[in-house]
Amino acid sequence: MVWLPPAALTLAVSLTGVSRAQLWRDELATWSAATRPVGDLVRLAGTIDAATGPYYLLMHGWIALFGDSTTALRLPSVLAMAATAGLTARLGERLVDARVGLLAGLLLAVLPGTSRYAQEARPYALATLLAVLATLLLVEALRRPSWARWAGYAAAVAALGLTHLIALTLLAAHAVAVLLVQWRDPAAAGLDTPPDGAERPADSRRRDDPPADDRPDVEPPGDGQPGDARPGGEGLGGVRRAGRHALLRWLVALVPAVLLVGPLVLVARGQRSRQLDWVDPARLTDLAALPGGVAQSGAVGGLLLGLAALGAGRLGRRALLPAACVLLPVLLVFAAGVVVPLWVPRYLVFTVPFGCLLAGAAPAGVRLAPALAVVVLAGLLGLPDQAGLRRTHEWPRSATVDYRGVARVIADHEQPGDVIVFSPRESWLFLDLGTAYHLGSRQPRDVLVVCDQRQRADLWAGECDRPAECLAGAGRVWLVVAGWRSDPAAAVPGAKGAALRDGFTVRQVWPRPGLTVALLTR
């Protein structure tokens, strides 16, 4: 039951204030996509966001059952992160021992980054869960090979690719483990430790362990004779023989992922320039900022990095798989990000549990109380960021975008026949989606729209080419613009701005964090 405390703690922390921060721009994209009919959702994937299409389809079914409130939209991510913490503990137990697993899971539970992505209606929490699950299933398949275990691994990898394409860089770490088992033996990959920790190296003895002479007798691992597999482990010779086919079985297990994810990759590749046009090329300084980025706290990220380095040294070869699961995806995405716009820290959140596993090994050699004090320290260091991420999901956290506040102003002052105009329209701020989410059927008519998001199979609506004509019948216009503007109409460019300034007068302006809403009349 080593998984239970981390899972329960993660669930409790992640549910705290889960709906306090309003949906931010990426979550608004999820809401817009997932609330469309399946046919329109498929068409959207052909235009933009194909890589996230399977997640949108999952959320479409979820919303049909549980609705689209902020809590309902984020609950799948909360559950996924809670399960991730439990599986991280289980993976640590399988690779090292129960104490390392417990500490790893608890560290993951208290990270601000865990709460941040647990409280977001995006695929990162689910991808993190599948990354840990796939790695755990790989360990099981390499230790006790069977087609059922390899089939489970194949399903997890395929689901991982469908959820988050970049998370498939994890397969580089899996390949290292498989090749070491194939060419040498499980010990070379750090997979020879019995899951119950029956034998630990001398350097891994905890201070509260009894002296060697006082320990109960434990049978040594099997000597490789036929049938010499004991509960919780198996004969090393038997594992070696099974390892002869590890590479072939692993490659076969990747076939479903190739068949399912391959077409998605081809479509997503064609959308890259539009999807990631805001991403800058990767720089070396980005690597230094990564721990704080994925942990959502510079202090906690630094602590986690230091603990992981100490833990890796303590674990020796048993650190190989978790260390590879951190380093290889990071290096691969960084190398690709130098050439193409790909380097976004949150894309690497799936590596965090493996860093926690290494970090959990650092204090595992002391008594439980001091070891837990390290977890408490990480939690205390992250408290300011925990509070901040529950205020807003924008970054920096001072850059709040208050869609809810704008919607409240309009709801309090609107009259029948009012219309609404947004500027800019084609922006990642999704001004129209933000107000539509909070106002629902009460939102004034979007007067300039001639082709809405569903009709365009896009995340943005299309506006009329002659704004003055489209505004001809309007008497009162609600204008929503990005940023603080003392004269909102003057901030609207082009023909749209000219039509507003020539035909209307600004009657009242309401500044809100990140936005300005104004009422214009003839």
Feature roles, as predicted:
Residues 2-190, 238-522:
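Membrane-proximal helix-loop-helix interfaces that form the catalytic/acceptor-binding platform
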Residues 182-245:
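Intrinsically disordered, low-complexity terminal tails and inter-domain linkers enriched
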